[in-house]
Swiss-Prot record:
GO molecular-function terms, A-Z: structural constituent of ribosome
Entry similarity comment: Belongs to the universal ribosomal protein uS2 family.
Region (Disordered): 224-261
Protein name, per record: Small ribosomal subunit protein uS2
Matching InterPro entries: Ribosomal_uS2, Ribosomal_uS2_bac/mit/plastid, Ribosomal_uS2_CS, Ribosomal_uS2_flav_dom_sf
One term under GO cellular component: cytosolic small ribosomal subunit
Length: 261
């Protein structure tokens, strides 16, 4: 039984890749066809690979592992934050600060500064300081919150990264590779899949596609934490799996043509 249905993927536009001139040849095995200059991703393979990713993340979570959700592009920011929080995990949804993983000790010092500033605001220290100084401290706090708020309570470097658009998150990917941290990622037709450990061939530009896949990874964490016997996070329609009818749906959608990206 698959954790996601072909219908859900189609409705979210997961199958729409990039323009054919912007492709990475290494993604050829995951491409179904080409339509009006756009590559169409093979959703039959995506369904299976989502299952692989789901089980991988679920196993990490079941062993009390830390999952870091990463997506700094505009289309991913909201989903990354909301789904990571729902799963009780951590996230980076604005600019990735170099050294976030490879220089974790320094990052922890900046996080401590953020916590200190928050405490100063809460205990009334700000009320006793000159307005100009408070304005500067607030500016510093807001900046730290923007970039580090999602990992403020992360106990240690993550056990796995879930990434939306590895091309954009190159620094995060390279840091994870240096530390042998596995990467699960949404990989579009313009991306090199070799830099990702567990790939999910997918449109990584459409908000609905990003939300759908990210929510499934959050579901995997929730299920892993609840235990193997608890399947409360799974949707009823998931049981339909991949069928010939589902493939016909994909072919029909391609024929009707829609050049969303």
């Amino acid at each position: 039984m698959s954790v996601i249905s072909m219908k859900q993927l189609l409705e979210a536009g997961v199958h729409f890749g990039h323009q054919t001139r912007r492709w990475n040849p290494k993604m050829k095995p995951f491409i179904f066809t080409e339509r009006n200059g756009i590559y169409i991703i093979d959703l039959q393979k995506t369904v299976k690979l989502i299952d692989n990713a789901y089980n991988f993340v679920k196993d990490v979570a079941a062993n009390d592992g830390v999952v870091l959700f990463v997506g700094t592009k505009k289309q991913a920011q909201t989903a990354i934050e909301e789904e990571a929080k729902r799963a009780g995990q951590f996230y980076v949804n604005h600019r990735w600060l170099g050294g976030t993983l490879t220089n974790w000790n320094t990052i922890q010092k900046r996080i401590k500064r953020l916590k200190d500033l928050k405490k100063m605001e809460e205990d009334g220290t700000f009320d006793r300081l000159p307005k100009k100084e408070v304005a500067l401290l607030n500016k510093q706090k807001d900046k730290l919150e923007k970039f580090l708020g999602g990992i403020e309570d992360m106990p240690h470097i993550p056990d796995v990264l879930f990434v939306v658009d590895p091309r954009k998150e190159q620094i995060a990917i390279k840091e994870a590779q240096k530390l042998n941290i596995p990467v699960v990622a949404m990989v579009d037709t313009n991306t090199d899949p070799d830099q990702v450990d567990v790939i999910i061939p997918s449109n990584d530009d459409a908000i609905r596609a990003v939300r759908l896949i990210t929510s499934k990874m959050a579901d995997a964490v929730v299920e892993g934490r609840q235990g193997e016997d608890d399947e409360a996070v799974q949707q009823e329609e998931v049981a339909e799996g991949v069928s010939k009818d589902s493939l016909e749906d994909l072919k029909k959608t391609v024929e009707e043509g829609s050049n969303e990206e």
